[in-house]
């Protein structure tokens, strides 16, 4: 039985609320697309004032081209029968400005594995909208490995296999919903995630292995096809690349980044799976997110390994560049055909660590089996707002105790978010002294706890709590 109380998500009930970060980034002179996330009763009307020439709002979807670099404030107004909401958003237009806050979206790997099909991707995109998940800011639908066939086509690039008959039609369908589309590749000669009907699938290099790099999956080829593949992804209409190899070196990362920058489309760029901290200066400047951890596999000991990976990178997170704790390992995964081994409390902890530790959040479960708990797990606007907060503060531990860790994150409104992780196997009691009397809110439950200068919390094993305080904690102890 679940211990942690969480509020029930009701994306299409009540007055409207805009769930968009206070800062949005985009490149000049490249196509821009954004679905304005709005919860509340339907129908709704949306208006925007302050948009430049070339960018328009159609329903909830902003699209067009920003012709000049710079900053501008756009006021968004939404109304329904229950009320009205207005929010001013800062648009920062320039090279490298995309995704100032962590990416929110869906990725196919845990949900479908290498069996993924074009139909799976397009149906998932529609389901994200129908369920209301997109109204909390999830804006990317990313296809992981399993789409690849052989080299060919107009650009001599990797072509899709028969499971993906029309990549352009797929991205068009995703874009029509106001969402962005992602793709997967690797600099290795052979990609991970090969579908069972193939013996291997190619990456972005060919030829003999380059002796400068390790021989993982055949190594990295001497002949580089990054430009070919980026040209093909551009023609298809993709907006995001997951680039996956081990060890994740900056030479190959930069070769791909440079080609993405030349594209007529703007690409978010994620590198995995062994982006070592010794290269943090590069990751923190040139990639939107980077991983150096195990794949999230949906059981407790694996979750702890992913969690522990954060501590080597926690001081390097910065605006636009975030350490990635991998896709969510929650819900039902079709590739395993069963629900994962995590309890509901452990799933809450898994989500909390991504949200509060400034990681991208990518859902990766089979949405046709989504239940009320899972929807509420993914769709807590107050938890997501902490992840998307534009103070861009680090989330750092103020207590590493016996089976319990407490993290602090300063927020843009001057309040503080605290995440408590009980990772041990025993119940833990904590007492925190605040700098003054404060309003304390249980963020998962969406309930105010008290006006207090002392916060006492009891945490059951394998649980997480998130509180938001109007005053800072000056000390916290484990009893």
Residue ranges and their predicted role:
Residues 4-16:
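Proline/serine/threonine-rich low-complexity linkers at boundaries of modular beta-sandwich domains
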Residues 15-43:
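Solvent-exposed, low-complexity, repeat-rich "mucin-like" stalks and linkers
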Residues 39-60, 87:
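Surface-exposed or secretory-pathway low-complexity segments enriched in glycine-proline
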Residues 60-69:
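Extracellular/luminal low-complexity segments enriched in Ser/Thr/Pro
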Residues 122-250:
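Aromatic-lined carbohydrate-binding/catalytic grooves of carbohydrate-active enzymes
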Residues 206-212, 216-218, 251, 262, ...:
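Glycan-recognition surfaces
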Residues 348, 354-357, 362-364, 400-435, ...:
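Carbohydrate-binding surface patches
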Residues 451-479:
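C-terminal beta-strand-rich structural cap/linker in extracellular carbohydrate-active enzymes
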């Amino acid at each position: 039985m679940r211990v942690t109380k969480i509020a029930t998500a009701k994306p299409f009930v009540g007055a409207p609320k805009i769930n968009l970060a206070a800062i949005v980034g985009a490149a000049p002179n490249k196509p821009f697309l954004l679905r304005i996330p709005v919860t509340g009763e339907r129908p709704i009307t949306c208006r925007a004032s302050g948009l430049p020439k070339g960018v328009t709002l159609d329903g909830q979807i902003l699209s067009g081209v920003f012709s000049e670099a710079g900053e501008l404030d756009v006021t968004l107004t939404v109304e329904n029968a229950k009320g009205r909401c207005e929010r001013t958003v800062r648009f920062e237009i320039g090279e490298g400005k995309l995704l100032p806050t962590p990416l929110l979206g869906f990725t196919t790997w845990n949900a479908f594995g290498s069996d993924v099909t074009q139909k799976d991707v397009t149906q998932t995109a529609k389901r994200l909208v129908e369920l209301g998940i997109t109204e909390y800011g999830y804006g990317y639908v990313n296809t992981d490995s399993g789409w690849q066939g052989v080299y060919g086509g107009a650009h001599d690039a990797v072509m899709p296999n028969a499971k993906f008959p029309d990549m352009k039609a797929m991205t068009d369908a995703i874009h029509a919903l106001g969402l962005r589309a992602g793709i997967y590749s690797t600099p290795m000669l052979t990609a991970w995630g090969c579908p069972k009907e193939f013996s291997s699938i190619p990456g972005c290099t060919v030829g003999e292995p380059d002796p400068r790099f390790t021989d993982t999956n055949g190594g990295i080829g001497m002949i580089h096809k990054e430009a070919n593949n980026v040209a093909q992804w551009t023609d298809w209409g993709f907006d995001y690349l997951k680039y996956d190899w081990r060890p994740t070196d900056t030479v190959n990362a930069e070769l791909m980044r440079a080609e993405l920058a030349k594209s007529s489309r703007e690409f978010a760029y994620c590198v995995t799976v062994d982006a070592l901290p010794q290269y943090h200066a590069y990751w923190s400047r040139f990639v939107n997110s980077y991983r150096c951890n195990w794949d999230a596999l949906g059981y407790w000991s694996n979750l702890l390994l992913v969690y522990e990976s954060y501590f080597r990178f926690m001081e390097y997170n910065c605006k636009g560049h975030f350490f990635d704790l991998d896709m969510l390992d929650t819900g039902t995964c079709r590739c395993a055909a069963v629900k994962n081994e995590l309890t509901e409390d452990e799933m809450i902890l898994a989500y909390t660590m991504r949200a509060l530790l400034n990681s991208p959040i990518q859902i990766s479960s089979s949405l046709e089996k989504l239940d009320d708990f899972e929807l509420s797990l993914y769709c807590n606007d107050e938890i997501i707002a902490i992840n998307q907060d534009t103070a861009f503060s680090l989330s750092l531990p103020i207590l590493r105790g016996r089976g319990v860790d407490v993290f602090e994150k300063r927020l843009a409104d001057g309040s503080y978010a605290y995440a408590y992780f009980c990772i041990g196997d025993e119940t833990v009691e904590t007492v925190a002294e605040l700098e003054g009397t404060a309003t304390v809110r249980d963020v998962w439950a969406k309930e105010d706890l008290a006006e207090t200068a002392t916060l006492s919390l009891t945490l059951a094993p394998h649980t997480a709590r998130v509180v938001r305080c109007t005053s800072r904690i000056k000390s916290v102890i484990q009893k």
